Amino acid sequence: MKRIKNSIALGAILLMLSPNVKAQTVKSPDGNVVLTFALKEGGVPTYTLDYKHKPVIKQSELGLELKRDKHASKGMNETDLLAGFNETSHKVSTFDETWKPVWGETATIRNHYNELEVDLNQPSSKRNIVIRFLVYNDGMGLRY
């Protein structure tokens, strides 16, 4: 009984230490590669990547630092896309197709992955961005 109370107390402490952290997870089709996306304090987008329960990429921040150009951005808010984000939505989907290359050693190529699409809003600049994570059995890719 004491163990259960300690576990509940530890869980409550961890929840208080990480307010509003909503992590989204997507696995590769075979389940070995696991990508986790989260917004850390200050609305900074981050991700981690594990392979067979071992970290491959530790927590890494995402974002774009924009060039300051007074002529190209007349009167625009030049806030970088590094922090201050809120997650507005997310969805997970699966893609699986086989295609035939024009030439090469392989007759067919399978393109099979699970995708996490995260929609973010930066209220200070009124910008919206979408980050897509494609998780394959042998790795991952991302794009803005």
Positions of PLM-derived features:
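Bacterial Sec-dependent N-terminal signal peptides
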Residues: M1-T25
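N-terminal accessory beta-strand-rich subdomains and adjacent acidic, glycine-rich linkers
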Residues: T25-R143
